[in-house]
Design a protein with these regions (language model features):
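Catalytic binding pocket for nucleotide-activated donors in carbohydrate/polymer assembly enzymes
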Residues: 1-116, 121-125, 130, 134-142
Length: 142
């Protein structure tokens, strides 16, 4: 198992344990986000990336049934309103495609298998048993 994700949340801890080089990290870092948001315009990203535009339009062009309106709300949350694409999903899209392509290229190779083994050997910190034990010690003082 490897992680394909942005370098935030639990992925930071996973990379600390297993090494960033053993995972597939894409997108803006937490340190970059503030500067990006000062000039960020999602509509420019959409217009510059036809593949992204096609994917985004499937949310509202009838490709998928949307009786609840959830897909339209998702589309609007990334393209309009007070703070469109708040989580920089559109901004990170091109880098996601690049890194995912690399992952698919690497898949099954000896190097990829090594990354998986390193990750598997490093996940003890994230086990439910450890979490429950730590919680019991912290909360119940056992």
């Amino acid at each position: 198992t490897v992680t394909l994700g942005t370098l935030d949340g639990a992925n930071v801890e996973i990379c600390e344990e297993a090494g960033r080089e053993n995972n597939y990290i894409f997108g803006a870092t937490v340190d970059e986000v503030g500067a990006i948001k000062q000039y960020y315009c999602p509509s420019e990203i959409i217009e510059q990336n036809p593949r992204l535009k096609r994917a985004l339009m499937t949310l509202v062009d009838g490709t998928f049934r949307d009786d609840s309106g959830m897909l339209r709300k998702l589309f609007e949350s990334m393209t309009t309103g007070y703070e469109p694409d708040r989580y920089l999903v559109l901004y990170d899209f091109a880098d996601y495609i690049r890194v995912k392509t690399q992952l698919l290229y690497d898949f099954g190779s000896e190097e990829f298998n090594k990354k998986c083994l390193v990750n598997l050997a490093s996940v003890g910190k994230f086990s439910a048993d450890r979490s429950v034990t730590d919680y019991a010690k912290l909360i119940w003082k056992t």
